[in-house]
UniProtKB/Swiss-Prot annotation:
Listed InterPro entries: Dihydropteroate_synth-like_sf, IspG_bac, IspG_bac-typ, NO2/SO3_Rdtase_4Fe4S_sf
Entry GO MF terms: 4 iron, 4 sulfur cluster binding; 4-hydroxy-3-methylbut-2-en-1-yl diphosphate synthase activity (ferredoxin); 4-hydroxy-3-methylbut-2-enyl-diphosphate synthase activity (flavodoxin); iron ion binding
Protein name: 4-hydroxy-3-methylbut-2-en-1-yl diphosphate synthase (flavodoxin)
Gene that this sequence comes from: ispG
Cofactor field: [4Fe-4S] cluster
Region entry Disordered, spans: 1-20
Amino acid sequence: MLDRDLTLSDDAYESSPVSRHKTHTVKVGQVKIGGNNPIVVQSMALGAHIDSDNIKSSAQKYAKEVIELAHAGSELVRIALNSEEVAKAIPYIVEEINKEGFDGKILVGCGQYELYRLIQDYPDNIKILGKIRINPGNIGFGDKRDEKFEKIIEYAITHDLPVRIGVNWGSLDKYLSQKLMDENSLSSNPKTSDVILRKTLVMSALGSAKKAEKIGLNAEKIIISCKVSRVQDLILVYTALAKSSNYALHLGLTEAGMGNKGVVNTTAGLTYLLQNGIGDTIRASLTQRPGESRTNEVVVCQEILQSIGLCYFNPQVSSCPGCGRTSSDRFRILTEEVNGYIKTHMPVWKKKNPGVEYMKVAVMGCIVNGPGESKHANLGISLPGYGEKPVSAVYKDGKYFKTLQGDNIFEEFKEIISDYVEKHYT
C-alpha cells in the first residue's frame, strides 16, 4: 500500500502551456516574429564567392544555398553584407528565391563595419531585403558612432525595414564596456568580470534599441539579440532582457561548436529559455564539418521546438536504443527505413494531409516496452526481441491491429503508414 504522505497532489502532474513572454510582433515579409506567433526558425548561409566580373552567375550559386535552407524549413535566411559584390548580387539572389516560390523577403542582411557605406552606395539593393541586422559594437568609432547609427536607422525607417540590433560578446561597444568596468572598480562591492560582461551586453542592446526608437523606428520594427558562447551566460542575459523589455528576442549562441557539442550546447540553452517563455526566433550556430550540409542547423532548431511541444514539423518517430534483448540490427534497420520513408513523403503530405506533422510512430526492438510504447503512438510496431524472428506486432491508435511476418515487414508497414495518413489527415 502506498503511503499517502509520500505522494504529491494531482496538481503536481498537470501540464500547462508555456506562458510566452509578451513581446512586440515584428513582421518580416510574410513572417511574423514575436507576440503570440509561432517561434520562427532561421539560419545563415555560408555564402559563395561573388565574382565581380560575373555578379549574376555568382549570385545564382549563392541563391542555391539560401533556397536549400528555405526548403529545409528555414523561414528566414541571413547573408553577410560584407562587400560591394554582395550588395550588387542581392537583386539576383532575391530573383532566384522568388522563382523557387519563396518570398524574397526571407533574405536578411547581416551588416557589420561595411553597412553604413553599403546603404549609401547601394540603397536600392539593400532596401529589398526582408530585414537588416546591425551590431552596435561595429557601427562606428569615436565621434562617428552616433552619426552612423542614426543614418542606418533613418535608412531603415525610410524603407520600412525591420532591424535586429544584434550585440555580440566578441565585438562589444568598447566605450560602454570600459565605462562599466571603471564604475565597477570604484564600487564598494565590485562584481566579477562575467557579471559586468553580461550587464554590458544587455545595456548595449537595450540602449541601442531605445536610441533607435528615439530616432523614429517603431518598437514593432525592432528585434534584439545578445550573442555569447556559454550556455549559462545565454540564460542569464536573456532572462535579464525579458525582464527589462518587450522587444522581440532572437535566441542563439554565437558559436555553439561542431558535432554533438554544438547540438548539446544549443539545445541546453534554448530549451531552458523557450520553456520559460523567452524567445521569438531561434538559430543554431553550428560549425559544419567539411562537406556537411548547412541545413543541419535548421533540423536542430525544429527538433528542439518539437521536442518541447512548441511547434510541430514532422511526425515523431520513437525508437528504442537496443540492449541484450535484441540480438540483431533488424529493428535499427526498420527504424532507419521508417524515418527515411516519412522524410521522403513529407513534402507531399504537408500540402495534401494537414496535421500529419502531429502523427506519432513507434519502432521498438523487443516485447519488454514494445507493446506499451506502441500503444502510446498513432502507429506502433514491436519486434519480438531475442531471436529476432521476422515477426512484428502492429498497433493502431493504442489497439492491436495485426502481426506482420516474413521478409517484407517494412514494405507492409510502409503501406500501413501511408493508409493511415490518407485516412486520418485530410
